[in-house]
Regions:
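Extracytoplasmic
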Residues: 113-116, 132-137, 146-154, 165-167, ...
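C-terminal solvent-exposed extensions
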Residues: 80-108, 114-116, 127, 162, ...
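Extracytoplasmic/secreted envelope proteins and their assembly/folding machinery
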Residues: 134-136, 167, 171, 179-187, ...
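Sec-exported extracytoplasmic/periplasmic mature domains
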Residues: 141-144, 159, 175, 187-191, ...
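Flexible, polar/acidic helix-loop-strand segments at domain edges
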Residues: 210-298
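Amphipathic, coiled-coil-like alpha-helical scaffolding segments used for oligomerization/assembly
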Residues: 172-240, 313-315, 319
Length: 417
């Protein structure tokens, strides 16, 4: 009986040996691709881990707390009775405010797994022997569901109950217990779940902006006058020639770190500290714009330069999550505001300090809507940076001779009495 060619075991075996099957080729190719991906992932993780490890991560339990009497004199900014702006309260009125604040304990803190809250802190200190006051506090909330990033400035003079210490200005919390105490105070006060913070002092902020290559800022004549005074003061502390940094007048400038930080610190032009918080948010927004323009190599170098300057308690897994989502987050809608909101607070004079007392129920409701709701907010910017320009006596006393009569007339400056 005859047998077909392909029925011959020997011939069939030789036929199969002519070359590898497409399945084997695909299998080998996939293994190679997988190996490359894994190797690349390991490399990226290793580089990323080294970068993240270079930051100044401080676990909450390692942050020391101090008593108020241990703080240096500069920690408390007192205001004389003659210069006060707040109402002097009798004991019953102050107790009523405390009772209203105590009722906040009945309000639930909002938690949402689709919202990430991070507190950005700008620290004011002349030496490293203490934590410093939190001169700038911005609550950054990333809402992945609404695809919105809200940046809300929390004014430093807000009257709050600091856990374990009692009633004081909000910025005193950082001086007493660093980032952990500040975030705890904000969580208890505003009923927003925030446990993570990232802090830089002014000297580090200067380095960050310089590493970025500077940022574009538009300033008025009056803002330049005041910023120049801050530049001279900071340069004196840093051992720099301040006159290499001062600006000639109002306009749009590509500012280096000293110039940008001096602009952000200004609370003497416009509506006092309200306008300053707007300037601080303006600086942050310009930093973000510069970061958006960077290519991969520039961004990598910037991250290497900046991370060691930041003190924070953000876990590495959270940083990786933010990094991987960064391209998407940068496309989100950005909104900004500040607390206290317009027409929703009072100013009182307590313990030789002017304090801001928000209408807490409506303030918390509005903040929660900004972060977790539809995000509809009323922009306070117009009221923060009014066209009228005011420069207080406090500034002219600190920097005599910077404001001459001609400049005062041209800029429309009103010296407060």
């Amino acid at each position: 009986m005859s047998r077909r060619y392909d029925d011959n075991p020997l011939m069939n075996h030789n036929h199969r040996k002519q070359g590898p099957s497409w399945k084997k080729i695909m299998g080998i190719s996939l293994c190679i691709i997988l190996a490359i991906v894994v190797a690349g992932g390991v490399l990226i993780y290793t580089i990323g881990h080294e970068l993240i490890s270079s930051t100044n991560f401080v676990a909450d339990e390692d942050v020391k707390t101090v008593q108020e009497e241990e703080l240096p004199e500069e920690a408390k900014e007192t205001v004389s009775a003659e210069e006060k702006k707040g109402r002097v309260l009798d004991e019953s009125e102050l107790n009523e405010i405390h009772q209203q604040m105590n009722q906040l304990s009945d309000v639930d803190t909002v938690e949402d797994e689709d919202v990430y809250n991070l507190l950005l802190v700008g620290v004011d200190r002349r030496d490293k022997t203490w934590n410093g006051n939190s001169d700038s506090m911005m609550l950054v909330s990333i809402n992945h569901t609404a695809k919105r990033v809200s940046v809300v400035s929390l004014m430093r003079d807000t009257y709050v109950d600091i856990p374990g210490y009692g009633y004081n200005k909000l910025n005193a919390a950082y001086a007493l217990g660093g980032g952990p105490l500040l975030t705890e105070t904000i969580t208890d006060t505003y009923k927003v779940d925030v446990s993570r913070y990232a802090a830089v002092d002014f000297e580090n902020m200067i380095q960050i902006i310089d590493a970025l290559g500077g940022i574009d800022l538009e300033m008025t004549d009056a803002e330049v006058e005041v910023a120049n005074g801050y530049m001279l003061d900071m340069c004196n502390t840093l051992g720099l020639n301040g006159y290499d940094y001062v600006l000639p007048g109002g306009g749009v400038y590509h500012c280096n770190g000293v110039q940008a930080v001096a602009y952000a610190r200004n609370r003497y032009v416009g509506n006092s500290d309200y306008a300053r918080t707007e300037r601080q948010r303006y600086v942050i927004s310009q930093i973000i714009e510069e970061v958006k323009r960077m290519d991969v190599a520039q961004l990598t170098q910037f991250v290497k330069d900046v991370l060691p300057l930041v003190t924070h308690n953000v876990e590495e897994t959270e940083i990786w999550d933010l990094v991987t989502k960064a391209p998407e987050i940068l496309q989100y809608k950005f909104v900004q505001d500040r607390i206290p909101y317009d027409n929703m607070y009072d100013v009182i004079y307590v313990d030789s300090q002017d304090m801001l007392v928000p209408q807490w129920e409506t303030t918390i409701e509005k903040l929660h809507n900004t972060i977790y709701g539809d995000g509809s907010i009323s922009d306070n910017s117009d009221n923060d940076a009014e066209n009228k320009v005011e420069v207080s006596d406090e500034f002219t006393d600190d920097y005599p001779g910077l404001l001459d009569a001609e400049t005062e007339t041209e800029a429309g400056i009103v010296i407060q009495q």
